[in-house]
Swiss-Prot record:
This is L-lactate dehydrogenase. It is a peripheral membrane protein. It is found in: Cell inner membrane. It comes from Pseudomonas fluorescens (strain SBW25). The active site is at H275 (proton acceptor). It catalyses: (S)-lactate + A = pyruvate + AH2. Keywords: Cell inner membrane, Cell membrane, Flavoprotein, FMN, Membrane, Oxidoreductase.
């Protein structure tokens, strides 16, 4: 199969993965309107082409929280990554390090913090949910700190799980889910051997180490469902801000006032995110939410963005809308599922090439030069 874009990796991942896993990556909440809008709204943003400008010395490098990045991209935290490829979190972290960008490990990863951090040539980031079990949160923070994690990403848009209808149909949840997953795995023998058999253990590494016992998919669903905390407020996070001395990012911001509250709280950065359209259907796409948020707080903290980003062209669009860098979730998960570490490295090469073309044809030579003037009819 010819691979030239993230959409090609999506098709390859769909062929390789059992349906329940592919739909878990690919699906969103409710009827998935917001999930689709994330990509479609971004695609409608027009860049301003410029000609006869010297763009010979072009660079994708940038700096985020004092860390130099070879391009303004971070691999986003994605749950169960170790089920898409054998020890998938390790492979993704290695790919990111080789390409000079950060990798962020999910709370609900298969591989534990210690395994991933020890095998990455670059310090990793760690994502943490706000959960009722504060003991787990403290344990995870202490382990992350001991493993050399540099940056903490706090996901705050999950006080309750989103209604993901596709998961019920695919076997991730719903009646006879375990039996349906087993039958699906039997139809994908390559995945069943490489990941299902050779990728063991399939524990949720960060959780099982805390609980002191193996944790499997049903444990993941049940434990998380019982631990989401709808009572959480900014005040409940104060102890974490005091404990964590490195950069702390609040992920899940869609409203300018919430962004201002993050500044008051003392966050170093935010991620403008609707969780890839996986939480509340009907909210703004991140392409539409980003500009007013960047205008409100862009001078006070680092603004990052995710959701709907499928190309280097999309990265340039998001930077022009006000982001400092972009997080890649689904795109990197597709590439990992399709071809492991090599797939992720190739995807990042594709993004870099697409960015270079976009920058060349819009007449900019550095990431810092990309701003609202790079766009037609947006934020001018």
């Amino acid at each position: 199969m010819i691979i030239s874009s993230a959409s090609d990796y999506r098709a390859a991942a769909q062929r390789k993965l059992p349906r329940f896993l592919f739909d878990y990556i690919d699906g969103g909440a409710y009827a998935e309107h917001t999930m689709r809008a994330n990509s479609s709204d971004l695609a409608e943003i027009s860049l301003r082409q410029r000609i006869l400008r010297n763009v010979d010395n072009l660079s994708l490098k940038t700096t985020v929280f004092g860390q130099e990045l070879d391009m303004p991209v971070i691999l986003s935290p994605v749950g169960l990554t170790g089920m898409y490829a054998r020890r998938g979190e390790v492979q993704a972290a290695k790919a990111a390090a080789n390409k000079g960008v950060p990798f962020c490990l999910s709370t609900v990863s298969v591989c534990p913090i210690e395994e991933v951090a020890s095998q990455s040539a670059r310090a990793i980031w760690f994502q943490l949910y706000v959960l009722k079990d504060r003991g787990f949160m403290r344990n995870a923070l202490e382990r992350a700190q001991a493993a050399g994690v540099t940056t903490l990403v706090f996901t705050v848009d999950m006080p309750t799980p989103g209604a993901r209808y596709r998961d019920a149909h695919s076997g991730m949840s719903g009646p006879f889910a375990a039996q349906r997953r087993m039958l699906q795995a039997m139809t994908k023998p390559q995945w069943a051997f490489d990941v299902g058999l050779m990728g063991r253990p399939h524990d949720l590494g960060n959780i099982s180490k805390y609980l002191g016992k193996p944790t499997h998919l049903e444990d993941y669903i049940g434990w998380l469902a019982n631990n989401f905390d709808p009572s959480i407020s900014w005040k409940d996070l104060e102890w974490i801000r005091e404990f964590w001395k490195g950069p702390m990012i609040i992920k899940g911001i869609l409203d300018p006032q919430d962004a201002k509250d993050a500044v008051s709280f003392g966050a170093d950065g935010i991620v403008v995110s609707n969780h890839g359209g996986r939480q509340l259907d009907g909210v703004l796409s991140t392409a539409k939410a980003l500009p007013p948020i960047a205008d409100a707080v862009g001078d006070d903290l680092t603004v990052l963005v995710d959701s709907g980003i499928r190309s280097g062209l999309d990265v340039v669009r998001m930077l022009a809308l006000g982001a400092k860098a972009c997080l890649l979730g689904r795109a990197s998960a597709y590439a990992l599922a399709a071809d492991g570490q090599n797939g992720v490295e190739n995807l990042l090469d594709i993004f870099a090439k697409e960015m270079r073309v976009a920058m060349t044809l819009t007449g900019v030579t550095s990431i810092e030069q990309i701003d609202h003037t790079t766009l037609v009819g947006q934020r001018q």
